[in-house]
Regions:
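C-terminal regulatory/oligomerization modules of transcriptional regulators
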Residues: 1-12, 41, 67, 72, ...
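N-terminal helix-turn-helix DNA-binding core of bacterial DNA-binding proteins
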Residues: 11-57, 63, 68, 77-79, ...
Length: 134
């Protein structure tokens, strides 16, 4: 019979863990990270992908993630100017974390009604594909 490993917690408070969980736990940050795990996106792509997220809050979160070295902003000189966002190596490393949270949600939050049936998770599909982070 397989036994589940209990994580070893060396201290009840770890400043690094606290900073990480506060960062990725901010409102809309998880949704932004999950969207960016599928590749590079323009600002308008992100607003279309994440319903209910205001332009102001998206801009604020992207700036925070950029300051943390998780997201990179690329300005493409064209007419009109194009701005793309993508995850850095540091951001891509969060893929396993986002995937684990998605799996946990699909296991334990199945009774929570989806706000929009068209936006439900694909049952049986992995939340984060290991091939999208390339």
């Amino acid at each position: 019979m397989a036994t589940m490993k209990t994580p070893i917690v060396q201290s009840p408070f770890c400043p690094l863990y606290h900073h990480a969980i506060e960062l990725i736990g901010r409102r809309w940050t998880g949704a932004i990270l999950r969207a960016l795990l599928s590749g590079q996106h323009r600002f308008s792509d992100l607003t279309a992908t994440i319903p209910g997220l205001s332009d102001r809050l998206l801009s604020e979160r992207l700036k925070e993630l950029e300051a943390e070295g998780i997201v990179e902003r690329t300005v493409i000189p064209a007419t009109p100017v194009r701005v793309d966002y993508h995850l850095t190596e540091k951001g891509l490393a969060l893929g396993e974390v986002i995937g684990a949270v998605s799996e946990w949600a699909e296991t334990w939050l199945v009774d929570v009604p989806a706000p929009d049936p068209e936006r439900e998770c694909d049952a049986g599909e992995p939340a984060i594909s290991s091939t999208t982070a390339a």
